[in-house]
Amino acid sequence: MIKVLFLFPKSVDLKTVDDLLANQLVPMVKQVQGFRAIQVNDGDIRSPGGPPPYTKVVEISFDSFDEMMEILQSQKSRSANEFLKSLGTLILLYDVREP
């Protein structure tokens, strides 16, 4: 399974992020074959090393790398990605497995 993790910095207005999720990101990824789940943090983000520099965490799961790439290569996704980068969002892509 492939996961995409979005870490939104504290400098970002939460209403902007919530609007992006509700109106663009969630509807877009739910249309992709191989989409499994989308999860968003609920409440404050904590870290044992002190307050983290992020205010919102979003994790999206796909069955495979190819299915994830289908969404990442679309024009809508490219536009959204540029917007996310302009916000200073950290985006991580990674495989997961059972230990």
Language model features with spans:
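Macromolecular interaction modules
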Residues: 1-99
